[in-house]
A protein has these predicted regions:
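General small-molecule cofactor/ligand-binding pocket signal
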Residues: 160-167
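Solvent-exposed loop/turn segments at secondary-structure junctions
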Residues: 42-45, 136-139, 168
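Short glycine/serine-rich loop segments
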Residues: 1-97
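A short helix-breaking turn/cap at a secondary-structure junction
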Residues: 56-150
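Beta-sheet entry/capping signal
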Residues: 35-36, 129, 160
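Conserved dinucleotide-binding and phosphotransfer motif residues
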Residues: 157
Length: 168
């Protein structure tokens, strides 16, 4: 929400809420206004909006990215994360923003050892075991079909899917 512009809209369905405090960033990226944006995440403020706008959001490890300019809800838990349109874009942005930052003591031990973009090998899911929770299926057939198609793609990429049953 913005006091200037009002309620942020989900660009894929203007009747749907874009979720979370980084919803403006996610909506802007999803609408094509920017190739990426940054948001702060305490308990889902990057990941929630990404999940409902068809974008990619990731919570980085605490201390890996600068929180300069962020007013923290929890100084020992808040992180800055990117919202992008693709996993590849996410990796490129992480390569640019991960590392020590002057003025943010939490990042003093941050390392730039990982090269995220170079880590995007096709074989990266070979041998991975991923838990699949199906308790949410059945509410929307279109979502169920998309979820199943995603599972098929994960298996094609070499992942082993393990069904997880949650007690209701």
């Amino acid at each position: 929400y913005s006091s200037y512009g009002g309620q942020t809209k989900n660009p894929y369905n203007l009747k749907r809420d874009p979720s979370g405090s980084s919803s403006g960033t996610a909506a802007a990226v999803a609408a094509g206004f920017a190739p990426f944006g940054l948001g702060s995440d305490t308990s889902g403020s990057v990941r929630g909006p990404a999940s409902v706008t068809g974008t990619v959001g990731m919570r980085v490890t605490y201390g890996q990215t600068s929180r300069s300019g962020v007013i923290p809800l929890s100084d020992s838990f808040d992180v800055t994360g990117a919202i992008t349109n693709t996993v590849e874009d996410q990796a490129l942005v992480l390569d640019a923003i991960v590392g020590p930052a002057e003025g943010d003591v939490a990042t003093l031990q941050a390392t730039q050892d990982t090269q995220y973009e170079k880590s995007l090998a096709q074989a990266s899911l070979k041998g991975a075991r991923l838990g699949i929770v199906n308790v949410f299926n059945g509410g929307n057939s279109e979502v169920d079909e998309t979820f199943k198609a995603a599972q098929n793609e994960l298996e094609k990429a070499g992942a082993t899917l393990v069904n997880i049953n949650l007690d209701k």
